[in-house]
């Protein structure tokens, strides 16, 4: 397979940036090198054309300034920079700060929502929020209690607010909301409470509901056409979801949407993934449990589905499919294709044609993945696109109240929501990963609204017979399905990556280090330990002719839930407390933004 088409890739990246950086999106200066969207662009590449900081001088980085958020617990996502203002968010209670970059980060305004603290009890993997969005002079925030708020970017005044869920039954909001054209796309969290997943599109002008697409249930609620919506090129047929569940289990069947969304303006398609089916005990939900664990492509205006691909039918290990979809234009076997690349929790990296939903590549991006021997890639096979499950590691085949040991990866996946980056200069994807395995014992559980609906006991540990650590940072070829290089880390890499035109890739570690590495080789070029563990995403911007790099630190998330919530039982945090127990020897709770610069 041939290398990527650099020009085509850059054209896609710039089209996404232009769509955001006009008067209706990223406003004040069309050419300003801002950070106007959480993922850098609609294609989710997390790539910046800034190159003032490069592989030759990054060793000279120093701290330019810091800002305390005043909130502990896990800080995911990143700030936004629009013109001369930086917008910073926090985990619950979801504060928002507007900082003046022309005046030493002076607080221009702050927003402090009043939320019922009882919502904390139903946030299964810490009180995180993955970041703000910007559109039409408004800062868009999704609060933990499922309220979407539009704030005037200049004053902080509430323009409108809309509540899209019910925390009383376990529904929360942790994913960033994404403005696309005249809509705001909003997911929902709560799969561990039997929440039925859905995507809601609100009208940008007033927050009213435009459309809603469920992950499970009747065709009319899925927003599918049984004859034209396809799965691997074939029509899904009538009642595709209902036929894959026993009875009414689909009504509490999960498939929640709490990851990242991408958008192709040429195809007018939105891409995202759905989460695990509920419960975690597979014996209680026979069937493929459609459309959980699925990549979805939908029309941005209507929500109608063009195609689906279910990666892990009848999920037995909590391998949510919510991770980001990265969009690139590439040449494959001599033909230019519009591609989508997805690094799933299940340990497989998928490359697909994002226009048709054709599956092109499905390979393990950590060699220790053992629950499957691989995906059937024969389009003429009855099992085309399905992973072949290894019986030894099948929690369904081993049954209830049986402890299935040595499953790789653990439930938190080879990668969770921490986003990868893509560089059109190297044609590589840079992926923060978890190198963790687990023991998994399912048990029968009854559904009660607002109570945990898990049904499994887990323990986690570093992948055996390896380097002894719990993470790697890798460079990946998406058209060949190969790792170019891998950097071992003591703990999972729970930070989002950033690639730049300076031939540098940045990421953070759970101990709290910001690390830039050489994009070609993975060689570490510098490191600085911030006050707390990093689960935020690295971002960069230019202000006053100077490039800066920013990162939120504040340990937490699933991997750091023991520290964040003060838990000590090894089985708590769905097994993460025991697996990451030694993290407390390296960091503590915090909540700080650290901004770096070069001298001069």
Swiss-Prot record:
Binds 1 PQQ group per subunit. Binds 1 Ca(2+) ion per subunit. PROSITE patterns: BACTERIAL_PQQ_2 (PS00364). Ca(2+) binds at residues 192, 276. The active site is at 318 (proton acceptor). Its cofactor is pyrroloquinoline quinone; Ca(2+). GO terms for molecular function: calcium ion binding; oxidoreductase activity, acting on CH-OH group of donors. Keywords: Calcium, Metal-binding, Oxidoreductase, PQQ, Signal. It is an enzyme of class 1 (oxidoreductase). Belongs to the bacterial PQQ dehydrogenase family. This is Putative dehydrogenase XoxF. It comes from Paracoccus denitrificans. The gene is xoxF.
């Amino acid at each position: 397979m041939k290398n990527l088409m650099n020009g085509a890739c850059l054209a896609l990246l710039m089209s996404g940036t232009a769509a955001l950086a006009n008067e209706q999106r990223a406003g004040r200066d069309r050419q300003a090198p801002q950070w106007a969207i959480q993922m850098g662009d609609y294609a989710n590449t997390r790539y910046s054309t800034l190159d003032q900081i490069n592989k030759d001088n990054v060793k000279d980085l120093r701290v330019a300034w810091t800002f305390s958020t005043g909130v502990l617990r896990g800080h995911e996502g990143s700030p936004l920079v629009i013109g001369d203002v930086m917008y910073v968010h926090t985990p619950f209670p979801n504060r928002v700060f507007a900082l003046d970059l022309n005046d030493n980060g002076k607080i221009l305004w702050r927003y402090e929502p009043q939320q019922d603290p009882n919502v904390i009890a139903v946030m299964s993997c810490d009180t995180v929020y993955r970041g703000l969005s910007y559109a039409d002079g408004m800062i868009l925030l999704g609060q933990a209690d499922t309220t979407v708020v539009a704030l005037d970017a200049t004053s902080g005044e509430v323009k409108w607010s809309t509540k899209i869920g019910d925390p009383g039954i376990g529904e929360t909001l942790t994913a960033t909301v994404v403005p696309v054209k005249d809509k705001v796309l909003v997911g929902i969290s709560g799969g561990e409470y039997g929440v039925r997943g859905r995507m809601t599109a609100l009208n940008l002008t007033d927050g009213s509901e435009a459309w809603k697409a469920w992950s499970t249930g009747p065709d009319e609620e899925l927003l599918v056409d049984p004859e034209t919506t396809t799965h691997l090129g074939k029509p899904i047929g009538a009642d595709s979801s209902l036929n894959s569940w026993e009875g009414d289990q689909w009504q509490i069947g999960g498939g929640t949407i709490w990851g990242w969304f991408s958008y192709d303006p040429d195809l007018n398609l939105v891409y995202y993934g759905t989460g695990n089916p509920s419960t975690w005990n597979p014996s209680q939900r026979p069937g493929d449990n459609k459309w959980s664990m699925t990549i979805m492509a939908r029309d941005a205006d209507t929500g109608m589905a063009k195609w689906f691909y279910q990666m892990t039918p009848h999920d037995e290990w909590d391998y949510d499919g919510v991770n980001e979809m990265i969009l690139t234009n590439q040449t494959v076997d001599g033909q230019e294709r519009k591609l989508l690349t997805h690094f799933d929790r299940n340990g497989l990296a998928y490359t697909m044609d994002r226009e048709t939903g054709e599956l092109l590549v499905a390979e393990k991006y950590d060699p220790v993945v053992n629950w499957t021997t691989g995906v059937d890639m024969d389009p003429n096979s009855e099992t085309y696109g399905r992973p072949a499950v290894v019986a030894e590691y099948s929690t369904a085949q081993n049954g209830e109240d049986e402890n299935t040991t040595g499953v790789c990866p653990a439930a938190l996946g080879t990668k969770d929501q921490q986003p990868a980056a893509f560089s059109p200069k190297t044609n590589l994807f840079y992926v923060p990963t978890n190198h963790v395995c687990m023991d998994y014992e399912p048990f029968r559980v009854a559904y009660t609204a607002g109570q945990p609906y898990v049904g499994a006991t887990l323990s986690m540990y570093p992948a055996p017979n390896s380097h002894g650590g719990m993470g790697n940072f890798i460079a990946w070829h998406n058209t060949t399905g190969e790792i170019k290089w891998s950097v071992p880390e003591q703990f999972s890499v729970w930070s989002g990556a950033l690639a730049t035109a300076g031939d540098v890739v940045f990421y953070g570690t759970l101990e709290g280090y910001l690390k830039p590495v050489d994009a070609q080789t993975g060689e570490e070029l510098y490191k600085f330990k911030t006050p707390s563990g990093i689960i935020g995403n690295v971002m960069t911007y230019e202000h006053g002719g100077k490039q800066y790099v920013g990162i939120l630190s504040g340990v937490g998330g699933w991997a750091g839930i023991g520290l964040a919530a003060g838990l000590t039982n090894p089985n708590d945090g769905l097994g993460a407390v025991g697996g990451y127990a030694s993290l407390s020897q390296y960091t503590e709770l915090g909540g700080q933004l650290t901004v770096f610069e070069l001298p001069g």
